[in-house]
Amino acid sequence: LKDGYPTNSKGCKISGCLPGENKFCLNECQ
C-alpha cells in the first residue's frame, strides 16, 4: 500500500484510477 491505496507492480494506484496518474497507469487500472 502507498498512501492508503493498493498499487500495481508499476507503483500506480489501482483504486478508482484517480486523476493525476499518467496515461500508462490509467491503462493499467482499466
Curated annotation (Swiss-Prot):
It is found in: Secreted. Signal peptide: none annotated. The keyword Protease does not apply. Residues 2-30 form the LCN-type CS-alpha/beta domain. GO terms for cellular component: extracellular region. Expressed by the venom gland. Keywords: Ion channel impairing toxin, Neurotoxin, Secreted, Toxin, Voltage-gated sodium channel impairing toxin. Transmembrane segments: none annotated. GO terms for molecular function: sodium channel inhibitor activity; toxin activity. The keyword DNA-binding does not apply. Belongs to the long (4 C-C) scorpion toxin superfamily. Sodium channel inhibitor family. Has the structural arrangement of an alpha-helix connected to antiparallel beta-sheets by disulfide bonds (CS-alpha/beta). Binds to sodium channels (Nav) and inhibits both the activation and inactivation of the activated channels, thereby blocking neuronal transmission. This is Babycurus-toxin 1.
